[in-house]
Amino acid sequence: MMRVGRTLANKKEIVAELKERLRESQMALVIDYQGLSDAEMKDLRQRLRKCNASCKVTKNTLMELAVKESDTWQPITQFLKGPSAFLLLKDDIGGAIKAYQEFQKATKKTTLRGGVMEGRALDEAQVKAIGDLPSKEQLMAQIAGALNAVTAKIAIGIKEVPASLARATQAIADKGAA
């Protein structure tokens, strides 16, 4: 039986879709997905979807065509060796990296080749460091807590000025009466 490959039009469509997905992404990771079952791949996609990220499996040559004219994504070409899956991260980068790391720990079947962010190639250690950063929600909570503490201290300070003035006035009055 002869196997029919993708048509040129179909390949162009895939490249256009990859370009669009990359345009929407802040970071891309390249993993070796060899050995994953369909169920495991579905599990990975579901974990990533919760963080507004996606997993795209495509031929390396099609990804090369998609990034050819983009300085931002060009460094990804150095990771295109063997079967590749592309994790495209949009908003919650830290959450998506953590989701992948948890998946990797559970299956022990994938390896992270590297990633690209803002036109820079990242190795596994750099990707892990980004994943260890607090999420946007955690940072907002920390900032809100810090602002709340500052306003509380200001309020206490403002309240303390008249109270100390009153105590000083009372001390002078007591001293004068004695």
UniProtKB/Swiss-Prot annotation:
GO molecular function terms listed in the Swiss-Prot or TrEMBL record: large ribosomal subunit rRNA binding
The keyword RNA-binding is annotated on this UniProt entry: yes
This protein's GO CC annotations: ribonucleoprotein complex; ribosome
InterPro entries in alphabetical order: Ribosomal_uL10 (IPR001790), Ribosomal_uL10-like_sf (IPR043141), Ribosomal_uL10_bac (IPR022973), Ribosomal_uL10_bac_type (IPR047865)
CDD domains given in the database record: Ribosomal_L10 (cd05797)
Domain of life: Bacteria
One GO process term, biological-process aspect: translation
Keywords recorded for this protein, A-Z: Ribonucleoprotein, Ribosomal protein, RNA-binding, rRNA-binding
Family listed: Belongs to the universal ribosomal protein uL10 family.
Function: Forms part of the ribosomal stalk, playing a central role in the interaction of the ribosome with GTP-bound translation factors.
Protein name: Large ribosomal subunit protein uL10
Gene transcribed to yield this protein: rplJ
